[in-house]
Amino acid sequence: MSTAGLRIAVAANTSWYLYNFRRNLMRALSDDGHHVVAVGGDGAFGQRLTEQGFANREVTFSGAGTRPWRELATVLELRRVLRDERIDLVLSYTPKGNVYAALAGRGLPTAQVMNVSGLGRAFTSLGVASRLVHLLYRQTVARAAWVFFQNEDDRRLFIDRGYVQVGRTSRLPGSGVDLDAFAPTPLPSRQAGSGVFLMVARLLWDKGVREYVEAARALRVRWPQARFQVLGPLDASARSGVPRATLEAWVADGLVEYLGETDNIRPFLQAADCVVLPSYYREGVPRSLLEAAATMRPVITTDAVGCRDTVDPGISGLLCRPRDAKDLAEKMAQVLMMTPEQRAAMGGAGRQKMEQEFDERSVIDAYRLRVALLKRAP
């Protein structure tokens, strides 16, 4: 590759993802002398990236869409961007971002570093769509110069199935967490028996929304003063999306408070006593749990791929069984019965874990090293 700075495209299916999860990496690469181009959809966040000094090219990804002609058009659109911008290296994220960048770059002098940030429902379910996802990964991952994984389960799965050679892979601590932006803050002054639980997620059944609501229903009988909040967007385009009418019924019944969606999660974390994500979605490493722990909030999540990596059980948080509302309710009850000092100790352990294992700077350093090695390659 060139001895000068590289022309690097950072690609995902939404500019929202790039702005919220990869902005600091893009800034670091730019500071290293590389020309960084953001490639994603949804123009509002693309404009924010432009305002921060990054080149931005919008490509229309279709979310959960699977119409062949629409998907082919996206690949061709992405290929034009790679060619017109004379891209040396693509850093790709999200399933469609990974696969489509690989297809778009065929025949071009463009290397690719993939980031497998969880496999989601399409990879683990049965049916034609799942088989297609497996086929596309099999055909594209092997061509990548390097593949980062966010958890060891996914890394071993790809290696064992022969999708990628072990020597071209490594594991990252998720997307990491900005420890300065998510600084430790004291828990609210609430006594044992009361508390605010917060679930942060897209409202998909696979994220454990049903289990969370059923746990709230059970807990309100004994602890009527406890509050159960949900923060995140509805996703009508997803097969497993929670219908708006169902959510409105839960709110009307007083089971949960719906907080909508936000670009700034920090004030909601600061108002919560515990953050809950009972997901069985096949996560990478959920960013919401990292941010919660960084702000010293105890965490409850599932003993499932990706989620379990964020918690030291009984120390920084609690693990429950996937798809088990009763077990989730029992873990939430444990938090309700804790003294303020016990909750603070658990939250403090979570912060320490983030500092030791999930600092975003370690993720950025891993990318910087990989880019430097690829730059020196013939």
Question: Residue locations for each model-derived region?
Answer:
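Donor nucleotide-sugar binding/catalytic pocket of nucleotide-sugar-dependent glycosyltransferases
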Residues: 57-58, 138-185
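Acidic donor-binding loop of glycosyltransferase active sites
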Residues: 255, 270-284, 297
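Short hydrophobic beta-strand element within catalytic cores of glycosyltransferases
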Residues: 298-301, 311
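Nucleotide-activated donor-binding/catalytic signature segment of Leloir-type glycosyltransferases, i.e.
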Residues: 232, 241-262
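Glycosyltransferase donor-sugar binding loop
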Residues: 40-44, 200, 227-242
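Conserved donor-binding/catalytic core segment of Leloir-type glycosyltransferases
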Residues: 186-207, 213-217, 229
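A short, well-ordered alpha-helix in the C-terminal region of glycosyltransferases
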Residues: 334, 341-357, 363-369
